[in-house]
């Protein structure tokens, strides 16, 4: 079954989706989040001068909030209570070289959710 079909089928019953969701759905959501993170897919893109929203990708993001529990996150300057699955991972564990390769500056204590693609600014 395609990722799009898995997500669209789950969306029809979104009120019943919880952290106990079946693994196929979790895998589909996590794959889309990973694809967003890498830039392989986008929730919306401009095609022939028209902005097209990819509904199944938007739905996958929303469903991800239903399959992960709230968590307490502690940082050096603050703590947060949020759906941590997207806050963990974008730059967690990055080295100086990883940051330089990514090409963006990130001020201390600024979380960047995992599903966000950050690209170099071109001037």
Protein language model annotation of sequence segments:
Residues 1-105:
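Terminal amphipathic alpha-helical/low-complexity segments used for targeting or macromolecular assembly
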Residues 100-123:
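Structural signal for interior beta-strand "rungs" in well-ordered beta-sheet cores
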